[in-house]
Regions:
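Conserved class I S-adenosyl-L-methionine
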Residues: 1-43
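SAM-dependent methyltransferase
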Residues: 137-217
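Class I SAM-dependent methyltransferase SAM/SAH-binding core
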Residues: 44-46, 51-94
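A short glycine-rich, Lys/Arg-flanked "PGG" loop and its adjoining helix->strand segment in the class I
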Residues: 120-132
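A short SAM/SAH-binding and catalytic strip from SAM-dependent methyltransferases
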Residues: 102-118
Length: 247
């Protein structure tokens, strides 16, 4: 899997694209789903596709977390806000750590599973890393029933430099489209401007191809792997899928 520019060359800028403090509500929602569905203790969590560690920076207040991602640069960034937390490079489709956890989280990184085969593989990884009674939370950005063309924009700045000049800055435009409604993908194009501390500015185009599946497909695949299944909706009206490994 080729890494998007945002997770490779631009990884050191990621917290200006999406700041960790914006993920406190997501983390609270994850904890709520887990407390409702995990049987027994809830102390450890494995995150697959943890990226810059934004959600984990809040979850680790309550849980002992292990973070995995395909991108070493993203894990390096995560370590700056999650010191002392275990960080491991790994592919959510094939990772096998040889141990189990009370919970598994796959946040929006699950969007990069663009076929049912890949999605099933990621779900199997989650199942294999759960103890009996443990639960997994999967949080795609879209399901087939909810995807609509959309645009978004944002970005943040670092604090000013010691001499008063602006620090680094980033701004982005995000454009979500579905070029072929008959297939299992949609695409998100980013136009990203980054301003270096010396004032120079670069422009990047980054296309993300992401998976799109119906709610029933999600539930059928989870059940096929062996999960007991539930659905929920988060504060942003996004579908959330929850699976528990039978005790």
């Amino acid at each position: 899997m080729t890494l998007p520019v945002i997770y490779g060359e631009l990884a050191p800028w990621f917290h200006l694209l999406t700041p960790p403090e914006h993920y406190e509500d997501d983390a609270a929602a994850v904890m709520g789903f887990l407390r409702e569905r995990v049987e027994g203790r809830l102390e450890t969590l494995l995150e697959l596709g943890s990226g810059g560690g934004n959600t984990a920076s809040h979850l680790r207040r309550d849980l002992r977390v292990t973070l995995t991602d395909l991108s070493r640069p993203m894990l390096d960034l995560s370590e700056t806000i999650n010191p002392g937390v275990e960080h491991l490079v790994g592919d959510m489709r094939t990772l096998r750590l040889g141990r189990t956890f009370d919970a598994v989280l796959i946040h929006d990184a699950i969007c990069y599973m663009t076929s049912e085969t890949d999605l099933r593989a990621a779900m199997t990884t989650a199942f294999e890393h759960l103890r009996p009674g443990g639960a997994a939370v999967l949080m795609p950005d879209h399901v087939r029933e909810t995807l609509e063309p959309a645009t978004d924009h944002g970005g943040e700045d670092d604090p000013p430099q010691a001499d008063g000049r602006p620090g680094r800055g980033l701004r982005y435009l995000e454009w979500t489209t579905d070029p072929d409604p008959a297939d299992s993908t949609y695409q998100v194009d980013y136009a990203v401007l980054v301003r270096h501390a010396d004032g120079s500015v670069e422009v990047h185009h980054d296309r993300h191809v992401e998976g799109l599946f119906s709610r029933q497909t999600w539930l059928d695949l989870l059940a096929g792997v062996g999960f007991e299944t539930w659905t929920a909706v988060d504060a942003y009206q996004r579908d959330v899928f929850i699976g528990r490994r039978p005790a």
